[in-house]
UniProtKB/Swiss-Prot annotation:
Residues 17-35 have a biased composition (Low complexity). This is Forkhead box protein pes-1. Disruption phenotype: RNAi-mediated knockdown in adults has little or no phenotypic effect on adult or their progeny. However, simultaneous knockdown of forkhead gene fkh-2 in adults causes 8% embryonic lethality, and nearly 80% arrest after hatching as L1 stage larvae. The lineage of its organism: Eukaryota, Metazoa, Ecdysozoa, Nematoda, Chromadorea. Coiled coil: none annotated. It comes from Caenorhabditis briggsae. GO terms for molecular function: DNA-binding transcription factor activity, RNA polymerase II-specific; RNA polymerase II cis-regulatory region sequence-specific DNA binding. Residues 128-220 bind DNA. It comes from the Eukaryota. Pfam families: Forkhead.
Length: 310
């Protein structure tokens, strides 16, 4: 048996020369660095003229960094003269829809439109409001976006703004319908599809209509001679955001045209090429010699002449 000789190979790392450690370098700030140069510039160096007119004073009170902030913030004065609205009473609503409470709290409310918080209607809902039915109707219509409301929307406005009518029976709704029908200030606007109607105010009255402060009823101004207004009708004669578009129905005159036009239409139906020639001759036609025809036109009459008059 021959003895086995195991030779160990040298370490691979020992084959490379060792690198001496490099000395650590610590950077020393240079007095001529860019930061030091920028710190040397002041406003007086850049613009000597401005230093005479501007005085920059930095104090702890002006910055507010060293003073503790107060827990209560006093409201700032209004610059434009409009009242500052209190936003603390706004209820939080979801971002998906717009809340009517948020919109109404940002806009000033008129005391003639809805009861104020200090009014008897708000403190005592069981007390009847001091407004007549026609005044309540005028409030509802004038506060609508299009100045026209359906009957159910008028009911909803009155019951929401005056809780007294929400607790009452439906007798007051009959009074609302009677005032809409009998008062000259209101008129009905039919919808274009004929499936409903809106109630609007007569715009011919203009600013003559107002709500009396003493009686709470709808009043008119009396300036000299009384003005004459046209009778209220179902048709819309005044400009309105929801106008009534009348449907066009052919009249009997259009259904039975002038005989000459009837002959032209019949000839065109038989031969369209004859129409230019007939129109050319039609320009030289004397309309003054045409006798007045009765209505309806007797196109066919078995008892006599078809052109005879009744």
């Amino acid at each position: 048996m021959l003895p086995l000789s195991i030779s160990t190979s040298p370490d691979p790392a020992s084959q490379f020369p060792t690198v001496p450690d490099l000395p650590t370098l610590t950077p020393t700030p240079s007095p001529t660095s860019g930061t030091a140069k920028m710190n040397e510039f002041t406003i007086s160096n850049l613009c000597p003229e401005a230093s005479d007119r501007l005085s920059l004073e930095v104090s702890p009170s002006s910055t507010g960094l060293l003073e503790p902030k107060s827990s209560t913030v006093s409201p700032a004065p209004s610059c434009t003269g409009y009242p500052i609205f209190d936003l603390t009473g706004i209820s939080k609503q979801s971002s998906s829809g717009v809340s009517s409470t948020r919109t109404s709290s940002l806009e000033p409310k008129s005391s003639a439109v809805s009861p104020a918080p200090s009014s008897p209607e708000a403190s005592n809902p069981n007390k009847r409001p001091a407004y007549s039915y026609n005044a309540l109707i005028a409030m509802a219509i004038q506060n609508s976006p299009f100045k026209a409301l359906r009957l159910s929307e008028i009911y909803a406005y009155i019951s929401n703004n005056f809780p007294y009518y929400k607790m009452e029976n439906g007798g007051w709704q009959n009074s609302i319908r009677h005032n809409l029908s009998l008062r000259e200030e209101f008129y009905k606007v039919q919808t274009t599809d004929g499936k409903g109607s809106f109630w609007a105010m007569n715009t011919q009255l203009g600013s003559d209509v107002y709500i009396g402060k003493d009686c709470g009823s709808l009043r008119r101004k009396k300036n000299g001679k009384p003005r004459k207004y046209s009778k209220r009708s179902n048709t819309v004669s005044n400009p309105n955001p929801i106008p009534q578009i009348p449907s066009f129905t052919p009249s009997p005159l259009l259904a039975t045209p002038f005989p000459l036009f009837l002959y032209i239409s019949q000839a065109y139906a038989q031969n369209p090429n004859l129409l230019p020639m007939m129109l050319q001759n039609f320009q030289h036609f004397n309309f003054q010699n045409i006798p007045a025809l009765s209505f309806p036109f007797p196109f066919s009459n078995s008892n006599g002449n078809p052109n005879s008059r009744n």
